[in-house]
Amino acid sequence: MFRPSGSGYRQKWTGLTLKGALYGSWILGVFPFAYDSWTRTLRRSKWLIAYGFVLNAAFILLVVTNDTESETPLRMEVFHRNALAEQINGIHDIQSLSMVSIMLLRSFWKSGDIERTLNELEDLQHRYFRNYSLEECISFDRFVLYKGFSVVLELVSMLVLELGMSPNYSAQFFIGLGSLCLMLLAVLLGASHFHLAVVFVYRYVWIVNRELLKLVNKMAIGETVESERMDLLLYLYHRLLDLGQRLASIYDYQMVMVMVSFLIANVLGIYFFIIYSISLNKSLDFKILVFVQALVINMLDFWLNVEICELAERTGRQTSTILKLFNDIENIDEKLERSITDFALFCSHRRLRFHHCGLFYVNYEMGFRMAITSFLYLLFLIQFDYWNL
């Protein structure tokens, strides 16, 4: 599955990014599966689950016992000026650690479902899609690279934020910082499993669409098309939609918590920025730039998560559009026409969408709504604490 989709520079970097995510997840204990090269399947390993549980519990314990921000002058200055900010920050710290714990526990709990889903993706790749040319699927490579780059950016942003805010670099500080970065990396890699799986589903749907276009072109020039070919594409499309639905149900709580955490961090970051720059009358300096870069990277990562799901959903909608092209072709074989009709009816009743927790679909519309809602929460927070600002 991780073989390069071509011999170009971009494809090699894509393969390297996928392997880096795989090996990094193994090392940090968030991918508790062993690969059996003989059967080409993943097997859940209880030893890897235990290793991941102990390792990440140790990270959380080290973060709690080695707080990197406990006595920073900036933090004390902001909290002395505004007591509500201190209370909100304490609640956010508890929420962040709880989110990390729940994400990891749910990933281990759902590891059996993850194993079956990833094995089915591997089975589709090996049995049906491995012989197709993938060099034209540029969006697949692009979004894999974007996702890998976003993980690196989030990690660098955390390092810049912590190092830029701390006045002294003690051994306790570096232990806490290292544990915090490793815990963040484990969370980001765990969340990236969903997005990378969605990108693979997108690539396979893109192949189905390309094959449908080839069939349309063949029929347009009078060549014969077998109905079995159309039935196979419908079968593959049906399995891909089932996989998309299963991925959404497995990772729904994790992804909701990650997206909400990004938005909460941005709301609180802007709120603390207002206290620091306006209430404390601080001029533009390096610390303000550190705040801003963290906000920008968080928002970019949040929007990338939305755009990956939007890409897959948009490609699924294109399938219905391609099937309409068969209406312009005359004298279609009756059996083939029935297969085309079945495919069109299936697309009219089911679509490739990612529904989280029964609440919302992940797409551009939802992304804009969540961004606007977070802005309204910021306004509410400012109005509530107006006299202290």
UniProtKB/Swiss-Prot annotation:
The keyword Signal does not apply. Glycans are attached at N168, N281. Residues 36-46, 164-170, 276-287, 388-389 are extracellular. Residues 1-14, 68-142, 192-254, 309-366 are cytoplasmic. The keyword Glycoprotein applies. PANTHER family: GUSTATORY AND ODORANT RECEPTOR 63A-RELATED, INVERTEBRATE GUSTATORY RECEPTOR. Belongs to the insect chemoreceptor superfamily. Gustatory receptor (GR) family. Gr22e subfamily. This is Gustatory receptor for bitter taste 22e. The lineage of its organism: Eukaryota, Metazoa, Ecdysozoa, Arthropoda, Hexapoda. The gene is Gr22e.
